[in-house]
Amino acid sequence: MLVFSGSDWCIPCIRFNKQILSDSSFLRFAGENLVLLEADFPQRKKIAAPLRQQYDSLAAAFNPEGAFPQLVLLSPQKKLLAYIPYREETPDGFITTLKHLLQ
């Protein structure tokens, strides 16, 4: 799962990180079912140029509109499976959504 985030300016991104990405039940599920990659686009913090180039390339392919947070489910072959709309929900609710999409 690819997560486009603005870690120091995007309030919904910060919420998603705290409520979902940091939750132990989600981390357990993700460890067994997903490869997680967060492409972070901070405004105040600098990231290394090579990493920024990789994130820009991912954004061009999977987030051309520049939506934040943008949650993208990809196959192991990097095929787009689904865009997952951000909603404030519980970790269990988000896990249920992912399980449905992974079937």
At which residue positions do the language-model features occur?
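Short active-site neighborhood of thiol/selenol oxidoreductases, capturing the structured segment around
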Residues: 1-10
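Hydrophobic beta-strand anchors of alpha/beta hydrolase catalytic cores
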Residues: 1-2, 36, 71
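Solvent-exposed coil/turn segments that connect beta secondary-structure elements
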Residues: 7, 41-42, 76-78
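Extracytoplasmic/secreted cell-surface and envelope-processing proteins
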Residues: 11-13, 46-47, 81-82
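Thiol-based oxidoreductase modules, predominantly thioredoxin-like and allied folds used
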Residues: 26-53
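Typically the conserved alpha-helix immediately C-terminal to a functionally engaged Cys/Sec
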Residues: 12-29
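Non-catalytic, surface beta->alpha helical segment in thiol-disulfide oxidoreductase systems
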Residues: 19, 60-103
